């Protein structure tokens, strides 16, 4: 009895080797304690070590892709050695679909894995960027100000067009703009199994390639048992989310079917910035012992009131005279000026026409197949098709009929050359192709992967005038412009990883990519389009990982990436500037990783050196498409930290930080000067060693989690983002101020008879009511050598809340 207090306070360990039935060890297997949030992975010899454990009863859970998850009940009285042999899985796991393009513990790549549980506890109906906001170097923004509708994400200062997104290994980025439109897939987070974020170039993948990072998404994996879920959220700005999820579980251990139906509505923080979003997800799969066939169909429909004009600086500051001057410069009508003067400082929306909306529907079809031929050779492939169609509608005052290819009209006793009108600008596109990957494990220390993809995109761009004050002889269905964009994208890659000694893992990754992009027809300004460019890219990557011990390793890598210009780089090109060129990136990464029971730590440094980088100039066109221009030499260098530590059974802390220097060696700024005769000339200004636009020097995040009793968790989330310049002149009169925002998340899980789980959740965003802007734009014009600069900002909501009630059956 005297020894009992000593025993209960003692710290013990569990260690051992994880192997398969043939006695071959399994490096990379996951070992965790049931009911605990920490775990470890096996080293190159299949060894694991759980330390600093109190005496007591534990359930050890061991999992590895392709093998059955095993649980072992243990009574811990002293240091324990527990060797475990895993049996092959009775069916092939869905993870094989994404393995070819993912990083792992041996990869010399900077990455972070985000589990289904982490996604779901932060899923209150906001778009995926806001759910991923607590990861290193990430900055998010919302046009409507509250995370629903049009949202954006940047990683290491790079916008969405430089973040390569794949869903089950299939490219998601729009082929022409290279952007990511999460509004087209509302509540997609409810159908995600896990996400891997790779920062920097990362591994070879399918799509246009990463210039800042990659999001590798795997959708829902099968549940062992049948289930039903009903998830509901209501909150500020009349935000409402309803989600129904159903699944059969495994039928005869071979078949599974899953489905989801969602709707999200929100009025938005910005005036009239309402969203009406609907989506569904259906999946059916056959699970053989050595093969997997899965069919996915998912779709999103959105109707979003436009809020992409931003707020003029004078309105944001409440500067009445500045607003009057701005109205005069813009040629506002009296009604438009009064609307500006009488709106809220932080909620102003220039659009007032009731149907000034963006309307789009997108349907995705995926057929995924994987085959494990033996313990050395496996194969997976996918066929996919996406069709999308939609338009945005606009009311326009006093438009020249000639801009729409229309003749003058006789009306009101005079010849009318201008008219008020309503127009629709359409996009109708198709995207289809195939991906594949072969994996050959020659021996325990040597692995080969060969894969690639071929995809085609066909896009139609056209406009219609559906109403005019002075109607012409044209019909509503007539197109006043017609443009096409055709893109063929082929890539193939080979990867090899080799461990010459136990502690060292080397890799080489070689990719060839060929792109043909053809633009034809006329654009929205009735200009002729005729581009037909073919690009050939070679993207090599090399790296090494050295394991210091079971818990820690060092890694370093060198990668090359190339990327073609997007459609807007051609169509937004200013008169007198050269055609856009493809850009190249040399990325150097080095880091240290440490993982044990309670502490998970990653630190890394990076250098990203660009040739001909296409950089935001700070301007946008009338549809919020950003202007970009090539700069000869530029770079991003930085330090990143990602850590989590379990302080006790009640407290845990997560922290991340990114500190960077983002510079352009020589930057030429172009300002358009308008002459009295209607001609345009360019005024140039030269700058040296300026900061790259939208690239904060510091991004710091943290989360303190408190679990006082079973089922309840509270998390205080904090985010600091340093100042960002709106353009590349490093002018303090054109910047976003630094901001520090804190959110509070509460969750309580409990059970009642007949219901497996009930979850009550509360998310209070911006609890200290920080007034901040996360995005903006700027442009300058000149007349008689007098330059005028206009700044616009996207204000984010103050304190707001989302309350959720979720049921699992």
Name each region found by the language model.
Residues 376-384, 545-547, 553-559, 581-637, ...:
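Membrane-embedded beta-barrel scaffold of Gram-negative outer-membrane proteins
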């Amino acid at each position: 009895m005297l020894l009992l207090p000593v025993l209960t306070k003692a710290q013990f360990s569990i260690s051992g080797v994880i192997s398969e039935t043939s006695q071959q060890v399994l490096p990379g297997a996951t070992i965790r304690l049931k009911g605990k949030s920490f775990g470890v992975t096996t080293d190159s010899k299949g060894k694991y070590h759980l330390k600093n454990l109190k005496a007591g009863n534990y359930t050890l859970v061991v999992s590895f892709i392709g093998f059955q998850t095993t649980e072992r009940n243990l009574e811990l009285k002293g240091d324990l050695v527990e060797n475990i042999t895993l049996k092959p899985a009775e069916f092939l796991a869905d993870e094989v679909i994404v393995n070819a393009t993912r990083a792992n513990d041996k990869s010399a790549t900077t990455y972070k894995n985000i589990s289904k549980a982490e996604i779901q506890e932060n899923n209150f109906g906001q778009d995926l960027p806001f759910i991923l906001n607590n990861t290193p170097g990430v900055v998010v923004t919302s046009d409507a100000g509250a995370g629903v509708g049009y949202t954006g994400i940047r990683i290491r200062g790079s916008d969405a067009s430089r973040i390569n997104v794949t869903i089950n290994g299939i490219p998601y980025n729009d082929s022409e703009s290279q952007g990511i439109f999460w509004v087209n897939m509302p509540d997609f987070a409810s159908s995600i199994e896990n996400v891997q974020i790779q920062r920097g170039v990362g591994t070879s993948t399918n799509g246009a390639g990463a210039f800042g990072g990659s999001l590798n998404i795997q959708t829902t994996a099968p549940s062992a048992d049948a289930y039903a879920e009903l998830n509901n959220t209501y909150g500020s700005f009349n935000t409402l989310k309803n989600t129904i999820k159903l699944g059969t579980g495994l039928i005869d251990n071979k078949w599974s079917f899953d489905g989801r139906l969602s709707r999200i509505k929100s009025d938005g923080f910005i005036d009239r910035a309402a969203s009406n979003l609907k989506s569904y997800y259906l999946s059916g799969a056959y699970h053989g012992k050595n093969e997997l066939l899965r069919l996915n169909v998912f779709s999103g429909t959105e109707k979003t009131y436009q809020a992409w004009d931003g707020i003029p600086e004078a309105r944001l500051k409440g500067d009445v005279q500045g607003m009057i001057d701005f109205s005069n410069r813009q040629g506002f009508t009296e009604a438009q000026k009064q609307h500006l003067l009488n709106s809220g400082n932080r909620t102003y929306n220039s659009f007032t026409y009731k149907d000034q909306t963006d309307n789009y529907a997108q349907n995705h079809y995926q057929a995924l197949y994987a085959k494990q031929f033996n313990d050395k050779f496996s194969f997976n492939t996918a066929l996919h098709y996406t069709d999308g169609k939609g338009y945005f509608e606009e009311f326009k005052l006093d438009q020249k009929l000639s801009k729409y290819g229309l003749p003058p009209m006789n009306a009101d006793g005079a010849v009318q050359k201008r008219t008020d009108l309503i127009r629709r600008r359409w996009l109708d596109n198709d995207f289809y192709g195939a991906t594949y990957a072969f994996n050959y494990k020659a021996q325990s220390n040597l692995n080969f992967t060969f894969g690639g993809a071929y995809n085609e995109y066909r896009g139609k761009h056209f406009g219609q005038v559906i109403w005019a004050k002075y109607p012409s002889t044209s019909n509503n269905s007539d197109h006043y412009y017609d443009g096409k964009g055709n893109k063929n994208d082929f890539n193939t890659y080979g990867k090899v990883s080799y461990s010459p000694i136990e502690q060292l893992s080397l890799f080489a990754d070689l990719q060839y990519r060929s792109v043909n992009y053809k633009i034809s027809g006329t654009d929205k300004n009735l200009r002729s389009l005729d581009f037909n460019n073919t690009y050939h890219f070679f993207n090599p990557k090399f790296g090494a990982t050295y394991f210091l011990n079971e818990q820690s390793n060092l890694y370093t890598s060198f990668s090359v990436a190339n990327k073609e210009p997007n459609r807007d780089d051609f169509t937004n090109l200013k008169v007198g500037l050269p055609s856009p060129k493809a850009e190249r990136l040399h990325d150097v990464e080095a880091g240290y990783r440490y993982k044990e029971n309670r502490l998970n730590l990653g630190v890394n440094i990076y250098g990203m050196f660009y040739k001909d980088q296409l950089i935001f100039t700070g301007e946008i066109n009338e549809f919020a498409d950003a202007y970009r221009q090539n700069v000869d030499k530029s770079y991003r260098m930085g330090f990143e930290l990602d850590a989590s530590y379990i302080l006790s059974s009640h407290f845990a802390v997560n922290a991340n930080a990114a500190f960077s220097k983002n510079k352009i060696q020589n930057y030429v700024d172009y300002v358009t000067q308008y002459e009295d005769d209607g001609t345009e000339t360019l005024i140039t200004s030269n700058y040296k060693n300026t900061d790259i636009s939208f690239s904060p020097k510091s991004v710091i995040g943290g989360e303190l989690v408190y679990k006082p009793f079973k089922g309840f968790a509270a998390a205080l989330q904090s985010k600091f983002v340093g100042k960002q310049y709106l353009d590349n002149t490093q002018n303090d009169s054109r910047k976003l101020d630094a901001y520090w925002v804190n959110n509070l998340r509460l969750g309580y899980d409990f059970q009642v008879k007949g219901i497996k789980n009930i979850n009550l959740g509360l998310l209070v965003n911006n609890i200290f009511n920080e007034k901040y802007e996360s995005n903006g734009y700027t442009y300058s014009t000149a007349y008689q050598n007098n330059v005028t600069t206009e700044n616009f900002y996207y204000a984010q909501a103050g304190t707001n809340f989302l309350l959720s009630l979720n049921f699992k059956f």
